[in-house]
């Protein structure tokens, strides 16, 4: 399971010209599911995302996590993160989770984070989405479990 996380001042996702999810300070999470992913990997990644210390403390050091700064999550499904780009000029998605598996683990990730008291907004699974953000830093990390 892969999460590309970006520290943002604000982010939103639109579908068909309508904003369906938006946050201010927090993390934009682009979430990719791979074939071998399961509930245990999802929980490990969700915990890591929420606990990752990438927000600045009073000394300007990345020392605080999402909860400590009162931030929110905007979680967007992104199957292309599971692409194999090692050969040729066209990505292979053979390692990506099935749509059914990905949808289930995506929703489980969202529910798990919300159950931990983190405000969560989402995109729409498998929709054509337009994602806008103001990256803070920029600070971007690729987390994988």
Curated annotation (Swiss-Prot):
It is found in: Cytoplasm. Keywords: Cytoplasm, Hydrolase, RNA-binding, tRNA-binding. It holds the Pfam family Tyr_Deacylase. GO terms for cellular component: cytoplasm. Its EC number is 3.1.1.96. It catalyses: glycyl-tRNA(Ala) + H2O = tRNA(Ala) + glycine + H(+); a D-aminoacyl-tRNA + H2O = a tRNA + a D-alpha-amino acid + H(+). A motif (Gly-cisPro motif, important for rejection of L-amino acids) lies at residues 137-138. GO terms for molecular function: D-tyrosyl-tRNA(Tyr) deacylase activity; Gly-tRNA(Ala) deacylase activity; Ser(Gly)-tRNA(Ala) hydrolase activity; tRNA binding. GO terms for biological process: D-amino acid catabolic process. It comes from the Bacteria. InterPro entries: Daa-tRNA_deacyls_DTD (IPR003732), DTD-like_sf (IPR023509). The keyword ATP-binding does not apply. NCBIfam families: D-aminoacyl-tRNA deacylase. HAMAP family: Deacylase_Dtd (MF_00518). An aminoacyl-tRNA editing enzyme that deacylates mischarged D-aminoacyl-tRNAs. Also deacylates mischarged glycyl-tRNA(Ala), protecting cells against glycine mischarging by AlaRS. Acts via tRNA-based rather than protein-based catalysis; rejects L-amino acids rather than detecting D-amino acids in the active site. By recycling D-aminoacyl-tRNA to D-amino acids and free tRNA molecules, this enzyme counteracts the toxicity associated with the formation of D-aminoacyl-tRNA entities in vivo and helps enforce protein L-homochirality. Homodimer. Belongs to the DTD family. A Gly-cisPro motif from one monomer fits into the active site of the other monomer to allow specific chiral rejection of L-amino acids. This is D-aminoacyl-tRNA deacylase. It comes from Shewanella loihica (strain ATCC BAA-1088 / PV-4). The gene is dtd.
